[in-house]
């Protein structure tokens, strides 16, 4: 894993992918949710800016489509509910594949990363806002003052994982 100046981590989603840009030199984040068209424009702009400034860039995409088996059903789901869940999961997987395809087309270095283990206290094992703040504090990173949603938190966690910095919690 080579060191990079800027890490763009993406948690693909139909309604708006979570995007976290981590600047290694300042240890600062830029985060938000973007639809696929806006994300493609953002990646083009960021690539051009990095080339002009002489920074290296990598895009990390959470690639849940690489997991061979995902179980999203509960015991009381009807057939219609099961079909709707499967359709939604498939649509999210396709967004991730399309982001990877755009990166390839735009000649932007990217990695497809298996989802990180869900070992947090938040809903469905996802990281909560408080846990993310504790993690950033434990890593001596500047505190994040804005609000976050699950997609943004997952993207931030992906970026921190890719950064190579030791992940430490501070309670």
Regions found by a protein language model. Name each.
Residues 2-171:
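Phosphate- and other anionic-substrate recognition elements at nucleic-acid/protein interfaces
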């Amino acid at each position: 894993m080579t060191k990079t100046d800027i890490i763009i981590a993406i948690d693909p989603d139909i309604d708006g992918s979570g995007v976290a840009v981590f600047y290694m030199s300042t240890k600062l984040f830029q985060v938000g949710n973007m639809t696929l068209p806006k994300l493609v424009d953002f990646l083009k702009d960021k690539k051009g800016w990095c080339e002009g400034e002489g920074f290296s860039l990598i895009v990390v995409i959470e690639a849940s489509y690489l997991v061979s088996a995902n179980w999203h059903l509960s015991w009381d789901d009807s057939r219609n509910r099961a079909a709707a869940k499967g359709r939604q999961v498939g649509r999210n997987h396709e967004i991730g594949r399309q982001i990877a395809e755009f990166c390839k087309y735009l000649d932007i270095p990217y990695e497809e990363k298996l989802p990180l283990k869900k070992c947090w206290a938040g809903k469905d094992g996802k990281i909560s806002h408080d846990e993310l703040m504790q993690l950033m504090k434990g890593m001596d990173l500047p505190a994040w003052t804005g609000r976050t949603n699950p997609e943004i938190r997952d993207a931030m966690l992906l970026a921190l994982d890719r950064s190579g910095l030791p992940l430490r919690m501070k309670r």
